[in-house]
């Protein structure tokens, strides 16, 4: 088995791990990179290049990628986001190394944005699929920078269908737009105690 790099490309952060083909040290590296793509897409490009330079040395490394960054508001829509992120990845890594995660599992990187719906925001399924092999009956609660996923697992199976979209998951309560970094204060509270007085919160970005 070759060594693997896992990349979860989010809109605010890129999460990376390196798993080596080593009987003693499997999980070799874990890192969190700040990549505020809505401010500059170059933050993602430079981070991908840094990982390629420092981690992905040699031909025996496979790079597995999942993304949610296509939802960042610097893109016109989700399709454009997937297309541009795939382009950044293609310009950094060789095809031979790349696999991309879809809700139907890892795929070869010879894909286009025509099947972008399988790729877009599929990291929830990757996490749930991994957990289902460890805990047969549970709820997965994954709190990210922007959103929270709540995914039921029963008898080792993910109860959310692979065809689930963000829209259907929002309707079911499996996707909640609350996170630890990008959630505006005004969406959580109407008032806060400030200088010993309850004060109404301004519903503007600068107030957060």
Each language-model region and where it sits:
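Nucleotide/phosphate-binding catalytic cleft detector across ATP-hydrolyzing
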Residues: 1-11, 17-141, 151-208
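Conserved Rossmann-like nucleotide-cofactor binding loop
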Residues: 12, 146
